Amino acid sequence: MSLQVPVAKEDNRESNSHLATLSGNLYTRMNLPHEPRARAGIVFFMEKQSNLALHSEFLLHVIIN
């Protein structure tokens, strides 16, 4: 039996552009080339970190309750 978790469908454009800005700022500070593929990798990594935090919080809530 698997646990089905409802996922809210929300507009991520604002958060995605914020992540793109953060990755662009990171590249500028580190003096790295602005290669789109590498920048997308940083945005993907940051999104994964955010998703991981949300899943961890959910699992903690399930375990405690």
UniProtKB/Swiss-Prot annotation:
Domain of life: Eukaryota
GO CC annotations on file: chloroplast
Primary localization: plastid
Compartmental location: Plastid, Chloroplast
Keywords associated with the record: Chloroplast, Plastid
Name by which UniProt lists this protein: Uncharacterized 7.4 kDa protein in ndhF-psbD intergenic region
Organism: Mesostigma viride (Green alga)
